[in-house]
């Protein structure tokens, strides 16, 4: 019978060194919670056999992954990594696991391939863990060996050279593979007799050695991908490495990225071969950029769809909006959630759309607000046009028919419909529906008087 291996992510800590109100695992990297990168690394290996221990501001962590299929275990009191494992043990055992891989939730650089290799090396051990060798071990737990055999892991603040000898530069990377039936008898023996007063998962190593179990430390050199994030400086360094990794991945897939060192792309974004991106630029969330689409510099996109042949000019802001084939956006345009541009539509400088649709070939080239509106095919919206969609209590819809022409500086007070082929004179305030093929003018008649001069 094949053995079953699962994974447990430790994500309950406060992350006090971040000096943030957010839990550490929710700190942002390229617009995504740090924890998402750990999920991305582990899900290909463990699928549904993946649990996350949460504790500090647990509801905030749940909310960040709302709608996603994750298994959470709550550590009511944050009493250390060993206590977190104890809190999750019942669920791990109920799942029938033979082994569990334990990973810290603050390792956003962790590659799937590294975990897969570690699993192969750890399969014959009762307790296995990954180690790094660093010139400056800092606050990481030290790996104590005797004749190359692992003896213990000792936290930096508890290390005593009189007991363990000269301080080593080999540190614990915080990734473990534990055989369930072997470790189960050790868990109750964890104590908090240390300077932090916490139950350390690292103490399982010393206990396993004392029981003559098979314990191995898998040496990984100086691999920076295994290091955790503990403070803002480390977060920034990790984000820079992730950003470079993602940009290189898309370049290798034939996406043309100019100044890639200035382009920030979410791990959930999808770029098709032949897309062209100019930095600096930010592409977040589940954005999709199609082939032959161009996104120019200083643009900000989140959950945006940019279809084939579309162009987004500089300084445009696009969020939860759809830009159709061969559309043109900007410069300095803002598409808010619910904005949809159909094929060949154009939105120019200082135009804002929200819950509005520009149908095929429609244009709003200058200084316009389109909110809760539908603009028919081929319609033209003049500069300074405003759809007045909010009466102070409710939002109302504006419908502009096919081929309609709205003159500059017009206000369309919703709910209102402008019929197909109709023309609204410049400067009008339209409060009533306009039939098809009509001319509507709603403004004061011009009066011209002789100029009076001072005597």
UniProtKB/Swiss-Prot annotation:
GO molecular function: glucosamine-1-phosphate N-acetyltransferase activity; magnesium ion binding; UDP-N-acetylglucosamine diphosphorylase activity
Region (N-acetyltransferase): 254-455
Top-level division of the source organism's lineage: Bacteria
Active site feature: 366
Region described as Linker: 233-253
Xref: SUPFAM superfamilies: Nucleotide-diphospho-sugar transferases (SSF53448), Trimeric LpxA-like enzymes (SSF51161)
Family annotation (InterPro entries): Bifunctional_GlmU, GlmU-like, GlmU_C_LbH, Hexapep, Hexapep_transf_CS, MobA-like_NTP_Trfase, Nucleotide-diphossugar_trans, Trimer_LpxA-like_sf
Quaternary structure and partners: Homotrimer.
Protein name, as recorded: Bifunctional protein GlmU
Organism, as annotated: Nitratidesulfovibrio vulgaris (strain DSM 19637 / Miyazaki F) (Desulfovibrio vulgaris)
């Amino acid at each position: 019978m094949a053995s079953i291996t699962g994974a447990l992510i430790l994500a309950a800590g406060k992350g006090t060194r971040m000096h943030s109100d957010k839990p550490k695992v929710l700190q942002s990297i390229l617009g995504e919670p740090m924890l998402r990168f750990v999920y991305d690394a582990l899900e290909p290996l463990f699928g549904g056999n993946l649990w996350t221990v949460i504790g500090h501001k647990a509801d905030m962590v749940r909310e960040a992954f709302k709608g996603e299929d994750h298994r959470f275990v709550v550590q009511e009191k944050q009493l250390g990594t060993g206590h977190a494992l104890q809190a999750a043990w019942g669920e791990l055992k109920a799942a029938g696991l033979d082994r569990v891989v334990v990973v810290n939730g603050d390792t956003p650089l962790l590659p799937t391939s590294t975990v897969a290799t570690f699993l192969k090396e750890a399969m014959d051990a009762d307790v296995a863990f990954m180690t790094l060798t660093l010139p400056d071990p800092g606050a990481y737990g030290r790996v104590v060996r005797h004749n190359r055999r692992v003896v213990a892991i000792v936290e930096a603040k508890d290390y005593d050279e009189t007991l363990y000898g000269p301080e080593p530069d080999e540190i614990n990377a915080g990734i473990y593979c534990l055989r369930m039936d072997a470790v189960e008898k050790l868990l109750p023996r964890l104590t908090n007799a240390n300077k932090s007063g916490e139950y350390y998962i690292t103490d399982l190593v010393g206990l396993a050695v004392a029981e003559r179990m098979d314990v191995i430390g898998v040496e990984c050199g100086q691999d920076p991908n295994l290091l955790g994030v503990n403070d803002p400086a480390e977060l920034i360094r990790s984000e820079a490495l992730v950003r470079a990794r993602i940009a290189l991945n898309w370049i290798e897939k034939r996406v043309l990225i100019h100044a890639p060192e200035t382009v920030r792309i979410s791990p959930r974004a999808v770029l098709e071969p032949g897309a062209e991106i100019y930095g600096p630029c930010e592409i977040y969330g589940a954005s999709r950029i199609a082939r032959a689409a161009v996104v120019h510099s200083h643009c900000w996109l989140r959950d945006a769809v940019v279809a084939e042949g579309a162009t987004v000019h500089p300084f445009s802001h696009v969020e939860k909006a759809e830009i159709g084939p061969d559309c043109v956006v900007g410069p300095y345009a803002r598409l808010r959630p619910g904005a949809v541009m159909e094929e060949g539509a154009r939105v120019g400088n200082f135009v804002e759309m929200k819950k509005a649709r520009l149908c095929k070939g429609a244009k709003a080239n200058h200084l316009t607000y389109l909110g809760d509106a539908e603009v028919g095919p081929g319609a033209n919206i003049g500069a300074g046009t405003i759809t007045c969609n909010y009466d102070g209590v409710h939002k109302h819809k504006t419908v502009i028919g096919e081929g309609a022409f709205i003159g500059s500086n017009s206000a369309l007070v919703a709910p209102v419909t402008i019929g197909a082929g109709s023309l609204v004179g410049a400067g009008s305030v339209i409060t009533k529906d306009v039939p098809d093929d009509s001319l509507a003018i709603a403004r004061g008649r011009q009066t011209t008087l002789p100029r009076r001069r001072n005597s």
